[in-house]
Amino acid sequence: GCCGSFACRFGCVPCCV
């Protein structure tokens, strides 16, 4: 999943919003 990934946690992609 994307949530919890480096990109998501550091705001590189809007997958956790």
From Swiss-Prot:
GO terms for cellular component: extracellular region. It comes from the Eukaryota. Expressed by the venom duct. The cysteine framework is III (CC-C-C-CC). Transmembrane segments: none annotated. Belongs to the conotoxin M superfamily. It is found in: Secreted. Intracranial injection into mice causes circular motion, barrel rolling and convulsions. The keyword Disulfide bond applies. The modification 4-hydroxyproline is found at residue 14. Its main location: secreted. This is Conotoxin mr3a. Disulfide bonds join 2-16, 3-12, 8-15. Keywords: Disulfide bond, Hydroxylation, Neurotoxin, Secreted, Toxin. One of its GO terms (molecular function) is toxin activity.
